[in-house]
Amino acid sequence: MAEKTAGPRPIILGIVGDSAAGKTTITRGLVRLLGEEHVTHVAADDYHRFDRKQRAELQITPLHPGCNYIDIMEQDFHHLREGRAILKPVYQHADGTFGAPVYVRPQQFTVIEGLLGYHTETLRECFDVRVFLAPPEDLRRGWKIQRDCSRRAYSTD
Protein backbone atom coordinates (compact mmCIF):
# COMPACT_ATOMS: atom_id res chain seq x y z
CA MET A 1 0.00 0.00 0.00
CA ALA A 2 1.23 3.51 -0.78
CA GLU A 3 2.75 5.50 2.08
CA LYS A 4 0.38 8.12 3.51
CA THR A 5 1.57 11.67 4.09
CA ALA A 6 1.14 13.02 7.63
CA GLY A 7 -1.40 15.78 8.20
CA PRO A 8 -4.77 16.64 6.69
CA ARG A 9 -5.88 15.36 3.30
CA PRO A 10 -4.42 17.46 0.46
CA ILE A 11 -6.64 19.79 -1.56
CA ILE A 12 -6.76 18.52 -5.14
CA LEU A 13 -7.19 21.09 -7.92
CA GLY A 14 -7.82 20.10 -11.54
CA ILE A 15 -6.95 22.23 -14.56
CA VAL A 16 -8.35 20.61 -17.70
CA GLY A 17 -8.82 21.74 -21.29
CA ASP A 18 -7.83 21.10 -24.88
CA SER A 19 -4.23 21.07 -26.02
CA ALA A 20 -2.67 24.56 -25.64
CA ALA A 21 -5.70 25.94 -23.77
CA GLY A 22 -3.41 27.46 -21.12
CA LYS A 23 -3.37 24.65 -18.55
CA THR A 24 0.36 24.76 -17.86
CA THR A 25 0.40 28.57 -17.71
CA ILE A 26 -2.43 28.61 -15.16
CA THR A 27 -0.81 25.77 -13.20
CA ARG A 28 2.53 27.58 -13.01
CA GLY A 29 0.71 30.67 -11.72
CA LEU A 30 -1.07 28.61 -9.05
CA VAL A 31 2.21 27.03 -7.95
CA ARG A 32 3.81 30.48 -7.60
CA LEU A 33 0.76 31.85 -5.77
CA LEU A 34 0.43 28.94 -3.32
CA GLY A 35 4.20 28.44 -2.91
CA GLU A 36 6.26 25.66 -4.48
CA GLU A 37 6.87 24.09 -1.07
CA HIS A 38 3.10 23.59 -0.62
CA VAL A 39 2.21 22.26 -4.08
CA THR A 40 2.62 18.97 -5.90
CA HIS A 41 2.17 19.29 -9.66
CA VAL A 42 1.03 16.31 -11.72
CA ALA A 43 0.68 16.36 -15.51
CA ALA A 44 -1.96 13.94 -16.79
CA ASP A 45 0.00 13.81 -20.07
CA ASP A 46 2.39 11.51 -18.21
CA TYR A 47 -0.31 8.84 -18.47
CA HIS A 48 -0.16 8.62 -22.27
CA ARG A 49 -0.19 5.02 -23.45
CA PHE A 50 1.83 5.66 -26.63
CA ASP A 51 4.85 7.79 -27.44
CA ARG A 52 4.68 10.42 -30.20
CA LYS A 53 5.98 8.07 -32.92
CA GLN A 54 3.50 5.33 -32.01
CA ARG A 55 0.61 7.82 -31.99
CA ALA A 56 1.57 8.97 -35.50
CA GLU A 57 1.68 5.37 -36.72
CA LEU A 58 -1.68 4.60 -35.10
CA GLN A 59 -3.17 7.92 -36.26
CA ILE A 60 -4.44 8.66 -32.77
CA THR A 61 -4.12 11.76 -30.60
CA PRO A 62 -3.86 12.08 -26.81
CA LEU A 63 -7.43 13.45 -26.83
CA HIS A 64 -8.65 9.89 -27.46
CA PRO A 65 -9.24 8.09 -24.13
CA GLY A 66 -7.70 4.90 -25.54
CA CYS A 67 -4.44 6.78 -25.96
CA ASN A 68 -4.14 7.13 -22.18
CA TYR A 69 -3.97 4.86 -19.13
CA ILE A 70 -7.24 6.14 -17.65
CA ASP A 71 -7.39 3.29 -15.12
CA ILE A 72 -3.93 4.12 -13.75
CA MET A 73 -4.85 7.83 -13.63
CA GLU A 74 -7.93 6.95 -11.57
CA GLN A 75 -5.87 4.87 -9.15
CA ASP A 76 -3.04 7.41 -8.80
CA PHE A 77 -5.32 10.44 -8.45
CA HIS A 78 -7.32 8.59 -5.78
CA HIS A 79 -4.11 7.81 -3.88
CA LEU A 80 -3.06 11.47 -4.08
CA ARG A 81 -6.47 12.53 -2.76
CA GLU A 82 -5.98 10.18 0.21
CA GLY A 83 -2.58 11.75 0.86
CA ARG A 84 -0.67 8.74 -0.45
CA ALA A 85 2.49 8.90 -2.56
CA ILE A 86 2.56 7.43 -6.07
CA LEU A 87 5.14 6.20 -8.57
CA LYS A 88 4.16 8.27 -11.60
CA PRO A 89 5.09 7.71 -15.25
CA VAL A 90 6.88 10.54 -17.07
CA TYR A 91 6.13 11.71 -20.63
CA GLN A 92 8.79 13.98 -22.11
CA HIS A 93 7.18 16.54 -24.43
CA ALA A 94 10.53 17.75 -25.80
CA ASP A 95 11.04 14.53 -27.77
CA GLY A 96 7.74 12.66 -27.33
CA THR A 97 9.20 9.72 -25.40
CA PHE A 98 8.86 8.34 -21.89
CA GLY A 99 11.37 8.79 -19.09
CA ALA A 100 11.86 6.89 -15.87
CA PRO A 101 8.94 7.01 -13.41
CA VAL A 102 9.20 9.38 -10.44
CA TYR A 103 8.04 9.08 -6.83
CA VAL A 104 5.52 11.84 -6.03
CA ARG A 105 4.28 12.82 -2.58
CA PRO A 106 1.19 15.00 -2.27
CA GLN A 107 1.67 18.33 -0.53
CA GLN A 108 -0.96 20.60 1.03
CA PHE A 109 -2.17 21.28 -2.52
CA THR A 110 -1.95 18.96 -5.50
CA VAL A 111 -2.57 20.51 -8.91
CA ILE A 112 -3.34 18.07 -11.71
CA GLU A 113 -3.41 19.40 -15.25
CA GLY A 114 -4.21 17.63 -18.48
CA LEU A 115 -6.55 16.77 -21.30
CA LEU A 116 -8.73 14.04 -19.79
CA GLY A 117 -8.67 14.71 -16.06
CA TYR A 118 -12.47 14.71 -15.86
CA HIS A 119 -13.12 11.91 -18.36
CA THR A 120 -14.76 9.52 -15.89
CA GLU A 121 -16.88 9.99 -12.79
CA THR A 122 -14.12 8.30 -10.78
CA LEU A 123 -11.63 10.92 -11.97
CA ARG A 124 -14.03 13.82 -11.36
CA GLU A 125 -14.60 12.64 -7.78
CA CYS A 126 -10.87 13.01 -7.04
CA PHE A 127 -10.95 16.81 -7.33
CA ASP A 128 -11.96 19.40 -4.76
CA VAL A 129 -11.79 22.19 -7.34
CA ARG A 130 -12.34 21.66 -11.07
CA VAL A 131 -11.43 24.24 -13.70
CA PHE A 132 -12.05 23.75 -17.42
CA LEU A 133 -10.25 26.09 -19.82
CA ALA A 134 -11.87 26.83 -23.18
CA PRO A 135 -10.23 29.80 -24.94
CA PRO A 136 -11.51 30.88 -28.37
CA GLU A 137 -10.41 28.29 -30.95
CA ASP A 138 -8.40 30.67 -33.16
CA LEU A 139 -6.42 31.87 -30.13
CA ARG A 140 -5.84 28.33 -28.83
CA ARG A 141 -4.69 27.12 -32.25
CA GLY A 142 -2.17 29.97 -32.50
CA TRP A 143 -0.83 29.17 -29.03
CA LYS A 144 -0.53 25.49 -30.00
CA ILE A 145 1.46 26.15 -33.17
CA GLN A 146 3.79 28.54 -31.35
CA ARG A 147 4.35 26.14 -28.43
CA ASP A 148 4.72 22.95 -30.48
CA CYS A 149 7.22 24.50 -32.89
CA SER A 150 9.31 26.27 -30.25
CA ARG A 151 9.37 23.64 -27.48
CA ARG A 152 8.24 20.27 -28.82
CA ALA A 153 10.25 19.81 -32.02
CA TYR A 154 7.27 20.00 -34.37
CA SER A 155 7.33 21.83 -37.69
CA THR A 156 4.58 24.12 -38.99
CA ASP A 157 3.70 21.42 -41.54
Spell out what each predicted region is.
Residues 3-10:
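Phosphate-binding P-loop
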Residues 23:
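Conserved lysine of the Walker
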Residues 26, 30:
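Hydrophobic positions on the alpha1 helix immediately C-terminal to the Walker A/P-loop
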Residues 37-43, 49-96, 109:
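Conserved nucleotide-sensing/catalytic segment adjacent to the nucleotide-binding pocket
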Residues 151-157:
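Small-molecule kinase domains that catalyze NTP-dependent phosphoryl transfer to phosphate-bearing small molecules
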